[in-house]
Amino acid sequence: MSSSHIFIGETIGT
């Protein structure tokens, strides 16, 4: 998990 998309499971990895 990076930073922003932790709430969706870091699918995008942004």
UniProtKB/Swiss-Prot annotation:
Catalytic activity: glycerol + ATP = sn-glycerol 3-phosphate + ADP + H(+)
Protein EC: 2.7.1.30
GO BP terms: glycerol catabolic process; glycerol metabolic process
One MF term in the entry's GO annotations: glycerol kinase activity
Family: Belongs to the FGGY kinase family.
Regulation: Inhibited by fructose 1,6-bisphosphate (FBP).
Domain of life of the native organism: Bacteria
Keywords: ATP-binding, Glycerol metabolism, Kinase, Nucleotide-binding, Transferase
Full protein name: Glycerol kinase
Pathway terms, separated by semicolons: Polyol metabolism; glycerol degradation via glycerol kinase pathway; sn-glycerol 3-phosphate from glycerol: step 1/1
Reported function: Key enzyme in the regulation of glycerol uptake and metabolism. Catalyzes the phosphorylation of glycerol to yield sn-glycerol 3-phosphate.
Coiled coil spans: none
Keyword Aminoacyl-tRNA synthetase: no
